[in-house]
């Protein structure tokens, strides 16, 4: 799990305290702030959604999304993560210059127990789903220069903003659109490849830390 990010609850100590009090108030009184609402379709998962999957599995939910004009594969969906991550090599391969990054003082904790300062933040449009059942939203990514088998990570608040439901059993995300329920299927083969690659990266880093006697 990665702690830190661009969400409201982590922007400042005052904002975090304010958010905590709001959550406490809802829990104690059952009242929520009045916001414009419209009826959303019911989202559910079916046994037919697990077709072409090997079971029982313990694979992560790894998807492909469209970021601006690029199809970005090997994107990890992490409900326990509080920061959208774009790894620097991917950022470079998309043709972006480092000057595009917005400076940030955000500190990330969770990469092997280490504290990592992002190179900066960048807001990019992300499209998921298939035409017509798709959505396009702006996502603010923290760009991190760190070894990873993944090209990026989608985090909890972004998934919530899509009103998305995720199922690691079905390796799928579903979300409401103007034209019904959109779907984003995970890639089980890519998930296995990323898992193996991450183990190799970890083994390499541990080897580098061994000192000669």
Where are these regions (language model features)?
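Short linear "hotspot" motifs
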Residues: 1-213
């Amino acid at each position: 799990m990665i702690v830190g990010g661009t969400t409201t609850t982590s922007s400042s100590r005052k904002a975090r305290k304010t958010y905590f009090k709001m959550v406490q108030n809802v829990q104690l009184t059952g009242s929520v702030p009045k916001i414009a609402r419209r009826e959303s379709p019911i989202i559910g998962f079916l046994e037919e959604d697990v077709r072409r999957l090997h079971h029982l599995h313990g694979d992560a939910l790894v998807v492909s999304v469209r970021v601006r004009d690029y199809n970005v594969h090997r994107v990890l969906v992490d409900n326990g993560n509080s920061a959208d991550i774009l790894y620097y090599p991917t950022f470079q391969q998309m043709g972006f210059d480092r000057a595009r990054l917005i400076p940030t003082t955000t500190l990330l904790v969770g990469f092997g127990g280490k504290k990592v300062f992002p190179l900066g933040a960048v807001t990019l449009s992300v499209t998921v789903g298939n035409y017509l059942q798709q959505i396009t939203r702006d996502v603010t990514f923290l760009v991190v220069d760190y070894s990873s088998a993944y090209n990026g990570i989608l985090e909890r608040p972004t998934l919530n903003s899509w009103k998305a439901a995720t199922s690691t059993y079905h390796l799928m995300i579903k979300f409401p659109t103007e034209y019904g329920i959109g779907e984003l299927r995970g890639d089980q083969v890519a998930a296995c490849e990323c898992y193996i690659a991450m183990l190799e990266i970890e083994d390499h880093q541990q080897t580098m830390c061994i000192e000669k006697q």
